[in-house]
Amino acid sequence: MKTLYSLRRFYPVETLFNGTLALAGRDQETTGFAWWAGNARLINLSGKLLGAHVAHAGLIVFWAGAMNLFEVAHFVPEKPMYEQGLILLPHLATLGWGVGPGGEVIDTFPYFVSGVLHLISSAVLGFGGIYHALLGPETLEESFPFFGYVWKDRNKMTTILGIHLILLGLGAFLLVFKALYFGGVYDTWAPGGGDVRKITNLTLSPSIIFGYLLKSPFGGEGWIVSVDDLEDIIGGHVWLGSICILGGIWHILTKPFAWARRALVWSGEAYLSYSLAAISVFGFIACCFVWFNNTAYPSEFYGPTGPEASQAQAFTFLVRDQRLGANVGSAQGPTGLGKYLMRSPTGEVIFGGETMRFWDLRAPWLEPLRGPNGLDLSRLKKDIQPWQERRSAEYMTHAPLGSLNSVGGVATEINAVNYVSPRSWLATSHFVLGFFFFVGHLWHAGRARAAAAGFEKGIDRDFEPVLSMTPLN
């Protein structure tokens, strides 16, 4: 195998440890990395690194399958998913499996199948990981040159990038095919309170799809997170899948241009840093999506968004007080603004009170009551349906607030229930993970750039106190 750089440049940081725990070819002396530096020991051992990655995939898929079955075993069909702390079943339900009108679960068998399929897949991946980590060839370059690589071989690296892009594109098309041909997906906007339907009229107009990317991220704009109909979501996946596949073919067939060869650092640690940066961005976008978007993440499964719960409370009390004889169109609140209804700065009729800040919420239970200028007073007086009242009362008491072991919802709300919304879990976890991955990107990018510049030497360990201590064994 070709040696890439001098070993000193390739293993820039010196780490010492008790050498008797060594595995042949993967110890401190031969790799420059101690056992706790994990896969860094495998930088030049493509076969062993393959084993580590396949085993890691096995762990991920095992978690998915085991957690899936755990949620199925604990699932109570009479309660909404978001009251049961579920995070996987809502994803399956959103894809249209096992649910009917209104998001009611009518069959849990597809969820069981999903869990079992993931468990079986994880066993295959686990076996492959153990095989390649312990039994398979240490390097792939000699026996399987197609799967071998040298980190600084720019052409090979972009070929690998291309293969990954094609796989991502195929993944995007899996959702498209599910929505178009295999039973459809759950649409929270379906008339009468949501239902599973096949998507027939895809949005493929580039001005609409790419218009989302050009929107402001603030206020009522909301960038791509503001998408609120499934035609746009599935059409966006057609575009994304096509771009990924075409880009993948491009990267397989071409070599990097001179500017790219000069601008980028071409080492294993550099690629790691690029990947961490990308995953960090995905994490931050996912955080915003699950927190604000009630189309891709229907409130029937994930609970209401924060703005949705707030608007639901205003709506619930408007309904109550209107029944008690209040004139909701003219009643004045304590600040002199409308108590139930007021006008936004641009003239729309919106809910009054503290929830005015969420005036641009769109939700399936509320939209039928809007007219051309915001909320329609005559519809509010004559057209409110029982299902809208029930749903808003339910969402009012399930605000995605609250911390662990706290009463979910507004702390002063006597009807709130003790739960933590899956939106809180998923948004918080993805924000925190996105941040950690960003720090990992900075760390590995800094090391990769320093190694490429040739001045990273690591910490001088000659006078470390631990060197004078008795070995652990």
UniProtKB/Swiss-Prot annotation:
Q: Which GO terms describe its cellular component?
A: chloroplast thylakoid membrane; photosystem II
Question: GO BP, one example?
Answer: photosynthetic electron transport in photosystem II
Molecular function via GO:
chlorophyll binding; electron transporter, transferring electrons within the cyclic electron transport pathway of photosynthesis activity; metal ion binding
User: Could you say which residues bind [CaMn4O5] cluster here?
Assistant: E367
> Which InterPro entries does this UniProt record tie to the protein?
PS_antenna-like, PS_II_antenna-like_sf, PSII_PsbC, PSII_PsbC_sf
Presence of keyword Metal-binding: yes
Q: Tell me where in this chain the PTM N-acetylthreonine is found.
A: T15
Task: Please name one Pfam family that this protein belongs to.
Answer: PSII
Its keywords, alphabetically, are:
Acetylation, Chlorophyll, Chloroplast, Chromophore, Manganese, Membrane, Metal-binding, Phosphoprotein, Photosynthesis, Photosystem II, Plastid, Thylakoid, Transmembrane, Transmembrane helix
Where Phosphothreonine occurs, the residues are T15
* Co-factor binding details: Binds multiple chlorophylls and provides some of the ligands for the Ca-4Mn-5O cluster of the oxygen-evolving complex. It may also provide a ligand for a Cl- that is required for oxygen evolution. PSII binds additional chlorophylls, carotenoids and specific lipids.
Q: What does this protein do?
A: One of the components of the core complex of photosystem II (PSII). It binds chlorophyll and helps catalyze the primary light-induced photochemical processes of PSII. PSII is a light-driven water:plastoquinone oxidoreductase, using light energy to abstract electrons from H(2)O, generating O(2) and a proton gradient subsequently used for ATP formation.
Family membership, please give it: Belongs to the PsbB/PsbC family. PsbC subfamily.
Q: Under which name does UniProt file this protein?
A: Photosystem II CP43 reaction center protein
